[in-house]
């Protein structure tokens, strides 16, 4: 908001918790129009419907920031297809669906929140590493097409997101991800 954002469309699978709702209200108090649309980014038709509906009374879409993700860590031989899909769906499928949706818009930015796991390949996080490697490659693909793209390889966030749980932080720390 301090840098000029006046309209924000947030996609989420669920309603915000109290602390998150307070942050959204703070943005509104600063003069930002905040619209929350419930949709799973891995469901392309639900995603398109949510975005198209929201944009009917909003300015054109200019930037996409993809932050979705989840963890389901285990050794590769213990991961079945459903556990792999659980991690790939929000990150990889969601990113691809956002990419396809973005082709209908003149974007200034397409930002993907990836992880250092994509190139460190930590033990027990093969599905998560693969999902994040997809984000990195999607950014390269978009750049090859002349489209905006940036993939940021984050470490663990201590106070928010998937790794905020102490058990996850300890696991990531043992793997050298800080």
Name each region found by the language model.
Residues 1-178:
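4′-phosphopantetheine-dependent carrier domains
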């Amino acid at each position: 908001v301090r840098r000029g954002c006046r309209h924000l469309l947030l996609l989420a699978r669920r309603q915000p918790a109290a602390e998150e709702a307070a942050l959204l209200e703070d943005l509104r108090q600063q003069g930002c129009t905040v619209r929350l649309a419930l949709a799973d980014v891995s469901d392309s038709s639900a995603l398109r419907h949510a975005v198209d509906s929201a944009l009917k009374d909003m300015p054109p879409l200019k930037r996409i920031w993809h932050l979705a993700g989840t963890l389901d860590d285990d050794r590769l031989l213990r991961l079945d297809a459903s556990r792999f899909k659980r991690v790939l769906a929000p990150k990889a499928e969601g990113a691809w669906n956002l990419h396809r949706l973005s082709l209908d818009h003149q974007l200034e930015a397409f930002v993907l929140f990836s992880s250092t796991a994509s190139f460190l390949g930590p033990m027990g996080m093969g599905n998560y590493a693969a999902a994040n490697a997809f984000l990195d490659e999607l950014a390269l693909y978009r750049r090859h097409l002349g489209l905006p793209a940036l993939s940021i390889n984050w470490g663990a966030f201590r106070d928010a997101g998937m790794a905020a749980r102490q058990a996850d932080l300890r696991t990531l720390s043992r793997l050298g991800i800080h």
